[in-house]
C-alpha cells in the first residue's frame, strides 16, 4: 500500500515517524563512524544539492544511505576516516548499504559503528587501511586522529589514488 502525503506532513517529525517513513538517500562519501557527505567532492566541489534529504533523514523512522564502495575505477574509496564535508551526522544515519553489504548502525557506539561499516560495506582493497586507521586512533569515545584523518583526501590530491596512503608518514 502506497500512501502519498504533502511535504508539510513529511517535514513534521512526529507525523513522518508515525507513518513509518523510510528515507533512502545517496552518499558521495561516508566516514567509518557513520557521518555522510552527500554533496561535495573532496569537500570543496559541489556535486549536487542537499534538497530535502536532511529533513527526510532526521524525520524518518529508518534512514538509509546507499553508495558504491569505490569510484574512479577503485582509486577513490567512498569510505574514509573522516568525511571532507558533513551533510548528515551519525546521529541521523541508521543504515548504510553498498554492493558488499549492509551496516545497521542503530544502537552502536562509534567504535562498533566503525567496525560494522568496515566489515560490511568497505571495498576489500581499503579494509586494511581503515582498520589500521581505527587502531591508531586517539583513545576516546570517537577515536579520531586529527593528524591523519584526511590522509585519504590528501593522497587523492597528490597521487590520484587513495590506495597509496602510507600511515607511517603520520
Q: What kind of feature is each model-predicted range?
A:
Residues 18-21, 87:
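Short loop/turn motifs at secondary-structure junctions and domain boundaries
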Residues 1-7, 11:
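Single conserved hydrophobic/aromatic residue that forms the stacking wall/gate
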Residues 14, 29, 33, 42-46, ...:
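Metallocofactor- and cofactor-centric catalytic cores in central/energy metabolism, strongly enriched
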Residues 4, 16-18:
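A short, aliphatic-rich alpha-helical micro-motif
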